[in-house]
């Protein structure tokens, strides 16, 4: 599995999908290899995680190059040392590397992600790149995977390309809320938004709308993102004393309890496929 931050899942939907799908494949006896990036250089990633072999490789710490540089390193490692039965590539933006896999006669399934060219963080050049990468993914993949019907419809209409629609799921979790006290919260006593701090997820809009309201219960905001300092400052500037900015919460049990105990969940995502935070 190539093209994301990998496992353990500590970032977004792709990483959650890899963890959930990868561990199930491993449980069925498949040998699963996940290429991963490490957000904490001082703490090495585990070499084996939930039955999956983890290969930690470096990446250029620049928004426009981080994914591509890591995917390129992953492809080189894969071709030299692994040569798998199949490669599962995440994100159509990684399609420039698909010819190398095809030349090695490795079947490729590409999870196309959402309509990345619509994201405001990319300028005209980035948007053109994403559109071209989508077309390349259609030509060079043995199979295309979409996680939402809208994405499948887009590829059918834009490229006359069939996709395998594999919708995300969400686990049924116990309805415990005992750990909310760690955050000085009570079940039913707060509003919640969980999102990566991207413009299209509209965390700032949610916070702005909340602070303009007469709501008495606090708004708990869970989320962060690399390269999002300016956007984070905007969210912080809109918040008042009723807004609790927790940053990223990677303790899954605690996060599940936050979902369970929320009076209202606010979801502002406007680009992409199915979002795991909404399903939960």
Name each model feature, range by range.
Residues 4-10, 24-62, 150-156, 225-227, ...:
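N-terminal strand-loop element at the rim of the active site
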Residues 68-80, 84-113, 117, 273:
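An aromatic- and histidine-rich active-site surface loop
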Residues 121, 167-187:
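Acidic anion/phosphate-binding donor-loop and adjacent secondary structure
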Residues 126-144, 153:
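Membrane-proximal helix-turn-helix segments that form the acceptor-binding/catalytic region
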Residues 151-170, 186:
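Helix-loop-beta element that forms the nucleotide-linked donor phosphate-binding surface
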Residues 181-214, 220:
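Conserved donor-binding/catalytic core segment of Leloir-type glycosyltransferases
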Residues 232-253:
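Nucleotide-activated donor-binding/catalytic signature segment of Leloir-type glycosyltransferases, i.e.
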Residues 257-273:
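Acidic donor-binding loop of glycosyltransferase active sites
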């Amino acid at each position: 599995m190539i093209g994301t931050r990998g496992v353990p899942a500590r970032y977004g939907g792709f990483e959650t999908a890899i963890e959930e799908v990868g561990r199930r494949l491993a449980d069925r006896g498949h040998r699963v290899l996940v290429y991963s990036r490490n957000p904490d250089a001082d703490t090495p990633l585990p070499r084996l995680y939930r039955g999956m072999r983890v290969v930690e490789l470096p990446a250029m710490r620049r928004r426009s190059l981080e994914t591509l540089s890591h995917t390129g390193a992953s492809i080189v490692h894969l071709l030299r040392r692994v040569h798998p039965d199949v490669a599962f590539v995440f994100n159509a933006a990684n399609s420039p590397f698909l010819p190398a896999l095809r030349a090695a006669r490795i079947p490729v399934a590409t999870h196309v992600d959402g309509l990345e060219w619509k994201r405001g963080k990319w300028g005209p050049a980035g948007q053109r790149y994403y559109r071209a990468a989508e077309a390349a993914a259609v030509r060079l993949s043995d199979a295309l995977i979409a996680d939402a019907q809208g994405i499948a419809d887009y590829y059918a209409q834009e490229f006359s390309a069939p996709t395998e629609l594999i919708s995300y799921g969400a686990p049924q979790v116990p309805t415990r809320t005992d750990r909310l006290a760690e955050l000085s919260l009570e079940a039913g006593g707060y509003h919640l938004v969980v999102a990566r701090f991207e413009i299209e997820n509209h965390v700032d809009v949610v916070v702005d709308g909340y602070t303009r309201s007469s709501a008495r219960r606090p708004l708990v905001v869970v989320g962060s993102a690399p390269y999002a300092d300016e956007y984070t400052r905007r969210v912080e500037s809109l918040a008042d004393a009723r807004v609790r900015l927790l940053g990223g919460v990677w303790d899954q049990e605690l996060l599940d309890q936050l979902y369970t105990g929320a009076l209202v969940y606010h979801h502002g995502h406007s680009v992409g496929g199915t979002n795991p935070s909404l399903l939960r």
